[in-house]
């Protein structure tokens, strides 16, 4: 594949929608699952793959997506308990990754995006294809930054991979205002 990954792994839950979406009513919607059950499934992958670093969403799920918040919560538990033989005892040999990182959007990127949106007559409190993302509320929350990765050298590869992900905007994510700002910051 485009990214050269050794594997892609799924937890076999159904995608939820943003708050208020009918998709959230599905019994297999990720955000509706017991957090410890999801954490046990994540522990299975941690123990099997033995990563040095575990990466998950920030505590607000990037843009307040219920699934992103749910997987954040489960991943934090899994990271903390992957070396506990009592937690998920059938999930393989215990293992402790060295570090846990959260992906978070650059607040400077969000602030510039909001200014540009207003300049072009767009409402930053109604972002996204469903107009259900409030960039102002996201920019108001900040998290400590412990590591930054400049992706300019791999931005074209990241964009190509993003074009394959139709449910996340596909080609639309590299067009228009977001694409312009993303290329300027090197953060698509």
Where are these regions (language model features)?
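A conserved beta-strand->alpha-helix junction
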Residues: 2-20
């Amino acid at each position: 594949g485009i990214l050269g990954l050794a594997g892609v792994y799924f937890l076999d839950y159904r995608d939820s929608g943003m708050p208020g979406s009918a998709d959230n009513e599905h019994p297999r919607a990720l955000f509706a699952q017991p957090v410890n059950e999801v954490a046990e499934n994540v522990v299975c992958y941690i123990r099997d793959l033995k990563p040095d670093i575990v990466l998950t969403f920030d505590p607000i799920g990037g843009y307040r997506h219920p699934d992103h918040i749910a997987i954040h919560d489960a991943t934090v538990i899994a990271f903390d308990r992957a070396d506990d033989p009592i937690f998920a005892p059938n999930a393989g040999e215990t293992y402790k990754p060295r570090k846990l990182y959260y992906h978070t959007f650059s607040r400077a990127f969000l602030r510039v995006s909001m200014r540009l949106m207003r300049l072009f007559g767009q409402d930053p409190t109604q972002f996204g294809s469903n107009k259900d993302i409030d960039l102002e509320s996201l920019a108001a929350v900040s998290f400590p930054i412990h590591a930054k990765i400049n992706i300019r050298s791999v931005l074209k590869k990241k964009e190509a991979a993003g074009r394959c992900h139709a449910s996340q905007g596909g080609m639309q994510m590299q067009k228009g205002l977001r694409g312009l700002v993303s290329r300027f910051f090197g953060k698509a």
